Each structure stands twice: as structure tokens, then as C-alpha cells.
């Protein structure tokens, strides 16, 4: 049970946050309510076109980031919170497929929210975000593995 709270609960909480973000709460209309005043505060002369570009970019970056974090949490849970003794590449693929499937269902869910639309582009951004998150995880895992190998080779050998 301790393993569940440490590894799987963060995954479930993050899924809940993604699901909540797929509702009207984080629709473009809602996010513009705080972003536009903030951008106008930063630059009172900012044009509406520039605001629209920044708003669009931040929303897409949000998709990328939320799925990078989701995939990283999922990979961590699969790697540490299960009894799977699979290769890292298999865990990578499982985490990526799970994130991709959730991205599809997330966009499907948005098709039922009046202020949202399902977007294949957003789904692809989500899937790319998951891939980026997993690549970062693999880089850290490889770095950690090479450090442990270096420490083992530096240990003095016992003389017989």
C-alpha cells in the first residue's frame, strides 16, 4: 500500500488535474480572463494580435507540459511501483501508449464540453509531450546508471 501512495497516487492526482483542465475551467475563454490583464500589465501597448499569439502558444505549451509530466509520473510508477522486471524500453513504450490513449480520451471528453472542442492537433501535442517527458526520464536513468557503474569500477580491488 505504501508503494501505491508513493508511486501511483501522484499519477492518479495528475490524471484528475488533466481531466479538470479539460472542463470549462481552463477553456480559452477562461484562461484569457487572467492572461489578458496580466499581459496588459506587463505591456500596456501590447496589441490584440500579440496577445492572441501568446495565449495560443501558452495553451499549446500547457498541453505539452501536462503530458510530459503525466508520462514521467507513469514511467516512474511502472518502474518503481510495480513488480514488473521489464526492460526500460518496454516500460517506456507502456507509459507512452498509456499517455497516448489518455490523450485520445481527453480530447474525446472535450468534445462533450460546450466551451471546448476536440482537436487532433492538441492530441498530437499531448502525445509529443509524453514522448518528451519519457526521453527526459531515460536521460536521467542513463545518467544514474553510468554513475553507479563508474563508482563500481573505482572501488579498490581486494588483494588476494
Stretch-by-stretch model annotation:
Residues 13-18, 91-110:
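Small-polar-interrupted transmembrane alpha-helices in polytopic inner-membrane proteins
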Residues 103-127:
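Interfacial helix-loop-helix junctions of multi-pass membrane proteins
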Residues 67-82, 128-142:
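Membrane-interfacial alpha-helical segments at the cytosolic side of multi-pass membrane proteins
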Residues 139-152:
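Membrane-interface capping segments at transmembrane-helix boundaries
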Residues 152-158:
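Short, low-complexity, charge-dense intrinsically disordered segments
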Residues 3-7, 84-93, 119-120:
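Membrane-helix interface segments
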Residues 1-75:
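"…centered on the first transmembrane helix and the immediately adjacent amphipathic helix/loop
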Residues 50, 54, 94-97, 101, ...:
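Alpha-helical membrane-protein architecture signal
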